[in-house]
Amino acid sequence: MQMPKTLRIRNGDKVRSTFSAQEYANRQARLRAHLAAENIDAAIFTSYHNINYYSDFLYCSFGRPYALVVTEDDVISISANIDGGQPWRRTVGTDNIVYTDWQRDNYFAAIQQALPKARRIGIEHDHLNLQNRDKLAARYPDAELVDVAAACMRMRMIKSAEEHVMIRHGARIADIGGAAVVEALGDQVPEYEVALHATQAMVRAIADTFEDVELMDTWTWFQSGINTDGAHNPVTTRKVNKGDILSLNCFPMIAGYYTALERTLFLDHCSDDHLRLWQVNVEVHEAGLKLIKPGARCSDIARELNEIFLKHDVLQYRTFGYGHSFGTLSHYYGREAGLELREDIDTVLEPGMVVSMEPMIMLPEGLPGAGGYREHDILIVNENGAENITKFPYGPEKNIIRK
């Protein structure tokens, strides 16, 4: 028996898409306008974020590649046989082609089936690895491969009204996760127990809010003591002690869309040294919230906030940029690097953008007030300023948790 290279699996009915049909039509139209302006015949996306953004399909790689082929007329997802009909059910597009494991590089055969020929093809330079780029080029020897990743990132940076609704729900659910952290927190309770409680609360809130939603990737980083020194440090078995500096980080993931709540906490009491540093970081946070508005330049915001840290002689303990964009992203895909509040980013804020304000300083072990301090709010930039959609309280008046 000759096993096929590709299949079409139409199993079940199409599911309800995350956004309206018009929303996806608008996204695909903007993409096609860019392709036409640059004389690009088709785009072959390979990243989680762009495939999700343009088709509502968020793949699970597990070592296999995926793609979305967009031409003037078609939007075709390319998925692995192991996923069955799920990619077809989710894809907002014209087709889904499944590649099998039976022959080497059937993935590229599926892409070529979706796009038999082209003179100029858009790819993602920041995602497609060298090996697969070479294999793709071999399939289209007469085609020029050009980057579309940067242009697509700029499209994603301006959020639609429907995306704003999604992000508002995410911010609300992140606050639910934060409340669950406080609920589970106690002396000698391990980090993982607190994190599990918060993640469960957020997953249930997502399920209560959305129909036909895929529940994947929601997580909590709850860090204590020395583990607060890195914003992305994993949850451990360390047990919380009274007087510990704590970092609450809740991340509800909804259809590939990221939101976050991050707060500094203390259990029972806070030393004078810790309190002083915490208040400095809150001062910067509050100043930053006022700077988010249309017309503000990312680099200027960063430099102005640096002056406050410098005034308190703690600028040397700052750890990363002051904020970043939101949308279809996670800890393993989708960073919109053109919209970050850093000294090396000169992007000007516009209505529709969604950014965080999240200053952090970290003092290493052995120094008075050692630990990592971070507050994180989400703001939607509008015509007149910005709306803070994070409601969870911050600062020493609210977040010294006494039980």
UniProtKB/Swiss-Prot annotation:
Reactions accelerated catalytically: creatine + H2O = sarcosine + urea
Keyword line: Hydrolase
Pfam families, per the entry: Creatinase_N, Peptidase_M24
Statement: the UniProt record of this protein carries the keyword Hydrolase: yes
Highest taxon listed in the record's lineage: Bacteria
Database matches in InterPro entries: Creatin/AminoP/Spt16_N, Creatinase/aminopeptidase-like, Creatinase_C, Creatinase_N, Pept_M24, Peptidase_M24B
Enzyme Commission number: 3.5.3.3
Gene Ontology MF annotations: creatinase activity
Active site: 232
Enzyme class, UniProt record, top EC level: hydrolase
Domain notes: Each monomer has two clearly defined domains. The small N-terminal domain (AA 1-161) and the large domain (AA 162-403). Each of the two active sites is made by residues of the large domain of one monomer and some residues of the small domain of the other monomer.
Family to which the UniProt record says this protein belongs: Belongs to the peptidase M24 family. Creatinase subfamily.
Quaternary state and interactors: Homodimer.
Protein's name according to its UniProt entry: Creatinase
Top-level taxonomy: Bacteria, Pseudomonadati, Pseudomonadota, Gammaproteobacteria, Pseudomonadales
